[in-house]
Design a protein with these regions (language model features):
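Short, basic/glycine-rich phosphate-binding loops at helix/coil junctions
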Residues: 24-30, 69-76
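Short coil/turn segments at beta-strand junctions that form active-site/ligand-binding loops
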Residues: 11-13, 56, 104-105
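Mg2+-dependent phosphoryl-transfer enzymes with acidic/Ser/Thr/Gly-rich catalytic loops
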Residues: 37-38, 74-76, 80-82, 89-174
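Substrate-recognition element of Asp-dependent hydrolases with the DxDx(T/V) motif
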Residues: 48-72, 82-83
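Asp-based phosphoryl-transfer active-site loop
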Residues: 9-28, 119, 152
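Non-catalytic pre-domain segments flanking phosphatase-related domains
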Residues: 1-17, 165-174
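Basic, amphipathic juxtamembrane/active-site segments
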Residues: 6, 13, 27-49, 129
Length: 174
């Protein structure tokens, strides 16, 4: 982990996640009745909970809108959920104004072109390992894990490590 990423992670007060390809593996499953389902990784969920327990706020901004994402956000206690929004930078502008935060205090984890404006603007903009090449090239860092396979956990732990809180977050389970 680079010192640059750790330095950027120190100021983070809000962590924002895309869903498809980040909290999931990016596959879309459509059933005969027209419904869809997604799979989420429990390691990622625990990482998000650890981050929130350490006082870092969390949000989801997704280009697609599905009930399953609302259910997952509620399950994890993520207070800020925006779905069906491709204009992610506009959404984040409004959220930052509401929370009284600056872009330098935001970390974002994404995987594809709609995420790129946010990745390039925030204090810590990261891409998952299997993100589009162009997105990985413009991110501050890239996770070792793929989307839906522990990338969000890695991202959360990076922030906690940068802020000197990872050991305490882990010790809470001893």
């Amino acid at each position: 982990m680079s010192n640059n990423l750790l330095q950027r992670g120190k100021a983070i007060k809000l962590a924002v996640f895309d869903v498809d390809g980040v909290l999931t593996d990016g596959r879309l499953y459509f059933l005969e009745d027209g419904s869809e389902f997604k799979t989420f990784n429990t390691l990622d969920g625990q990482g998000i909970k650890m981050l929130m327990n350490a006082g870092v706020q969390t949000a989801i901004i997704s280009g697609r809108k599905t009930p399953v994402v609302e259910r997952r956000a509620k399950n994890l206690g993520i207070p800020h959920l925006f779905q069906g929004r491709e204009d992610k930078l506009v959404v984040l502008d409004g959220l930052l104004e509401q929370l009284g935060l600056s872009y330098e205090q935001v970390a974002y984890l994404g995987d594809d072109l709609p995420d790129l404006p946010v990745i390039r603007r925030v204090g810590l903009g990261m891409a998952v390992a299997n993100a589009a090449d162009f997105v990985r090239e413009h991110a501050h860092g890239v996770t070792r894990a793929r989307g839906g396979e522990g990338a969000a956990r890695e991202f959360c732990e990076l922030i906690l490590r940068a802020q000197g809180r990872l050991d305490a977050a882990n010790a809470a389970y001893l």
